[in-house]
């Protein structure tokens, strides 16, 4: 059990730190939700690559469950979307939903293709 918790925890700490740093790196002139969008897109792309190339169970725990699970954020996406709706900005909320969903699906597909080619 501990042999699984350690890589999972390391990955989670690194993923959460990466998301925080990514949000800090987004310039103030860009809408605040952009950091989470980038995190979700990066995570979607990387999960495609990792799904094709990572076979060892502990590396999967570290990279996919830990790192990408902490890097990406459904809860942040949900809060951003609901906040836009509460601010009576339905077009922005729909754009947020589309960008996160369509972008993530496209990037996961691309990651799978690249991962399969590299494998």
Curated annotation (Swiss-Prot):
Q: Quote the record's binding site residues for Na(+).
A: 69, 72
Query: What gene does the UniProt entry assign to this protein?
Result: fluC
Check the record and name the NCBIfam families matching this protein: PRK14230.1 (NF010826)
Highest taxon, organism lineage: Bacteria
Organism, by scientific name, is Neisseria meningitidis serogroup B (strain ATCC BAA-335 / MC58)
Q: What is its main location?
A: membrane
Give the UniProt record's GO annotations in the biological process aspect. Answer: cellular detoxification of fluoride; fluoride transmembrane transport
* Its job: Fluoride-specific ion channel. Important for reducing fluoride concentration in the cell, thus reducing its toxicity.
Keyword annotations of the record: Cell inner membrane, Cell membrane, Ion channel, Ion transport, Membrane, Metal-binding, Sodium, Transmembrane, Transmembrane helix, Transport
Q: Name one GO molecular function term.
A: fluoride transmembrane transporter activity
What membrane topology does the annotation report for this chain?
Multi-pass membrane protein
Q: Can you tell me where the transmembrane regions are?
A: 5-25, 30-50, 59-79, 97-117
For this record, an example GO cellular component is: plasma membrane
Which named protein is this?
Answer: Fluoride-specific ion channel FluC
- Family designation: Belongs to the fluoride channel Fluc/FEX (TC 1.A.43) family.
Q: Which reaction does it catalyse?
A: fluoride(in) = fluoride(out)
Q: How is its activity regulated?
A: Na(+) is not transported, but it plays an essential structural role and its presence is essential for fluoride channel function.
Question: Is Repressor found in the keyword set?
Answer: no
Q: Which residues form a coiled coil?
A: none
Q: Where in the cell is it found?
A: Cell inner membrane
- Record's HAMAP family? FluC (MF_00454)
């Amino acid at each position: 059990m501990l042999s699984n918790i350690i890589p999972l925890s390391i990955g989670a700490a690194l993923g959460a730190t990466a998301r925080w740093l990514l949000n800090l790196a987004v310039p103030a002139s860009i809408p605040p939700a952009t950091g989470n969008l980038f995190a979700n897109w990066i995570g979607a792309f990387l999960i495609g690559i990792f799904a094709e190339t990572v076979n060892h169970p502990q590396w999967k725990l570290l990279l996919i469950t830990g790192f990408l699970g902490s890097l990406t954020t459904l809860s942040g996406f949900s809060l951003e979307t609901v906040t836009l709706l509460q601010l009576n900005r339905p077009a922005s909320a729909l754009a947020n939903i589309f960008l996160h969903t369509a972008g993530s699906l496209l990037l996961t597909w691309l990651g799978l293709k690249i991962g399969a080619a590299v494998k």
